[in-house]
């Protein structure tokens, strides 16, 4: 019995001791946890002072934290950074020395110590420490990187380059540090040296060519940088005549400098070396067209077609050639400079040439493509282009409508079907069949995908404006202008503000103006001038007078009445002192002298007038640019 009592007493005592131990451990854990929370809070506060540049406060907190956490890497690094920002290099050095006591051969700490001596104005000591690091293992590339990183941080790019070159020599590896050296050479505007380094990369790994082009572009945007790179690549190509990546970079550099003919020559070589059967030339033609270099684009596409191309690219190359001829015709065909004239039909014997392109020639190419590749998406695109030329260049409304109608029956591209319907509606507007125009837009609105709806809505708003339904037009325009990401937002806002601003001046004046705008859309230019002049005579006190006068000037230009256009614009600048369009009118005078009359001096005088009389105008920068171009100054 006594034994049992003793056992119970011993057990109770053991339990009490265990509970005491558990409670003690809990108390210690709670204390440690509280301490840890306090450390984290202080550390965050110090880091926030760092981020805001309050370095003194950061130092105070880091120093207090270091007393209880002498081995904490985060605290040590934060304190060293703060000392460096305050230029307390001696304290930063002492901090690093304390760390080195535990590991006196640590390369990273030694390189940092050397960097601190360098910042403190003791470069010889810094060099000595750094070379101690390097001598530990002269063939270890990472040691050179450690030292160079310190020099780069201090913006001592020349010395960093020396370290990298020393590393190359020691390791007998000329491929080391290529990207690092290229970047440093570029930063020092040593473009030839930078290009030599990038060439090493692309020769070792041709798949890196696109990446190297992006790196070269960091300085080839400057003419001196592009010229330097061009010289290096030309020399490399001359020494390595079978290396396609070098030709590709050379072609790219020519393209960057807008030297498309020279780029085309490189693509001919690339196509031959790679046995690409025209696909490389085809890609060049596409890119040149995207950059509006239509003559070399046309040459490339024609060479593809005339060669022995892969069968799958033939229709696309023919379409690309036709598109290039079409674009070249804009500047060379007399119809393009005198819109509104009608053209005779296109004969099969029409002459087609890159040097004397015509819209008739372009249409002949499209028609031939349709005949040879019927019932294809390419044929559908060609037919759409025929409709566009007939409408926008020849104003052949019947021919355009027939083409667009046929495109809508072809099932190869829903987007082209929508575009054809939009264009057909424009043809109906030009025919003054506004009821059919509205019907086309209503059908599109109910069936077209989201990207087309705002375009359709804007056209409907214009139609409402032409028909003097100004409230309806405003309601539709407000829907469009509410979408800030829409490409049409600015156009919608301009028309909306124009309607709202001028509707209060009187429905009759705005109705007359809108009818004149409709006649412009229908290319009834002479009748439109009469309508705008009616606004001037019948509503002389409205704000529409300024806009009507400017419209008359533009229409005189479209009718090739250049002197009359100049007279109208001078009326705005000289006789309408309250007009907010005087700067625009003066700018148009300069543009007429520059582009239509080819009188360089009078154009310069007109642009200088913009600078002198309208210093706050939005046209000032453009006027300055035009003056520099006309004088042959560097832009």
Language model features: what each stretch is:
Residues 1-40:
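Bacterial Sec-dependent N-terminal signal peptides
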Residues 35-635:
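Acidic, polar-rich low-complexity tracts and alpha-helical solenoid repeat scaffolds
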